[in-house]
């Protein structure tokens, strides 16, 4: 049989992306998360498809349809929990992937980075809408609180919120459209992922040193295919440990109570992966200010290439920047913790300090540290 790997139009695309792709010889396990995100996306689309076969997007039956999936559908419980915890694994990989990009200066690949930020926004939107679908207490009140934030937009805010709701409150129309969007967005994410990869392969991968690796490349297969398979096995192992031993570890008990518009839960909070942004939102007493800070906390990633003042791409040889990077990681963990706490002393002030620190680190301290390191190079 003739080997069509390099001649057939379709095979050629796959070959140039995953087989004969020249890759740097020194990329570490931090470069595994891209492929893991791809696996997470495929897993979410497949489990989501099977859930959609049994789910009903109606306020009267949504909650009981999820219960029906868990109790009556063959292996419905495992599909449901793989989907719910798969989202958590997705975001763990996302945060690691973005963190890798920040640490090693991958944001200098502008198109790849900007599409990555759009992908992050799209994934967050998808996850938020997915959380509304089981129609539990936290689903309903989470949807109410987060969509209500848009009312802070001057002049058009109130009309915009009612337009999104499809009425005067979160109701049947809201649930139906959220289900429709939650179904279509992963396919848009998949398409954007292809564009993300397309732009990445225009420049080639970065590497830990941040120095051009053109002189030292190895083929993607078998070196990185086997490495990606190992990463995938570890991902699936972690996911299945979570699903089979403590499926509700990352969920909220309130979501096992059917949605009730007349009874507000004592602490409304989103899923754990949104808590850092939620803490930033809550730390500003003004509604519009809070919403702006919330959006900017993610949108600030777009500014990273402009804030890069160092003569070196990577942080590998920049100890001051390294310290600040890990302070930023600690700050984000603090914000995540604060986001899950009630609004009372001392959590309020800790949240405000952590929020100020977050923006201060990215906008001021890290660019200043880079400039200092540039001057130290002259010595």
UniProtKB/Swiss-Prot annotation:
Role description: Component of the ubiquinol-cytochrome c reductase complex (complex III or cytochrome b-c1 complex) that is part of the mitochondrial respiratory chain. The b-c1 complex mediates electron transfer from ubiquinol to cytochrome c. Contributes to the generation of a proton gradient across the mitochondrial membrane that is then used for ATP synthesis.
Additional detail: Heme 1 (or BL or b562) is low-potential and absorbs at about 562 nm, and heme 2 (or BH or b566) is high-potential and absorbs at about 566 nm.
Major localisation: mitochondrion
Record InterPro entries: Cyt_b/b6_C, Cyt_b/b6_C_sf, Cyt_b/b6_N, Cytb/b6-like_sf, Cytochrome_b, Cytochrome_b_C_euk/bac, Cytochrome_b_N_euk/bac, Di-haem_cyt_TM
Cofactor(s) this protein cannot do without: heme b
Alphabetical list of SUPFAM superfamilies matching this protein: a domain/subunit of cytochrome bc1 complex (Ubiquinol-cytochrome c reductase) (SSF81648), Transmembrane di-heme cytochromes (SSF81342)
Segments crossing the lipid bilayer: 33-53, 77-98, 113-133, 178-198, 226-246, 288-308, 320-340, 347-367
Gene Ontology annotations of biological process type: mitochondrial electron transport, ubiquinol to cytochrome c
Alphabetical UniProt keywords: Electron transport, Heme, Iron, Membrane, Metal-binding, Mitochondrion, Mitochondrion inner membrane, Respiratory chain, Transmembrane, Transmembrane helix, Transport, Ubiquinone
UniProt: a ubiquinone binding residues: 201
GO cellular component annotations of the record: mitochondrial inner membrane; respiratory chain complex III
Matches recorded under Pfam families: Cytochrom_B_C, Cytochrome_B
Location relative to the cell: Mitochondrion inner membrane
Name this protein carries in UniProt: Cytochrome b
Membrane topology value: Multi-pass membrane protein
Entry's family note: Belongs to the cytochrome b family.
Binding sites annotated in the UniProt record for heme b b566: 97, 196
Binding partners and assembly: The cytochrome bc1 complex contains 11 subunits: 3 respiratory subunits (MT-CYB, CYC1 and UQCRFS1), 2 core proteins (UQCRC1 and UQCRC2) and 6 low-molecular weight proteins (UQCRH/QCR6, UQCRB/QCR7, UQCRQ/QCR8, UQCR10/QCR9, UQCR11/QCR10 and a cleavage product of UQCRFS1). This cytochrome bc1 complex then forms a dimer.
GO molecular function annotations of the record: metal ion binding; ubiquinol-cytochrome-c reductase activity
Cofactor: binding details: Binds 2 heme b groups non-covalently.
Positions bound to heme b b562: 83, 182
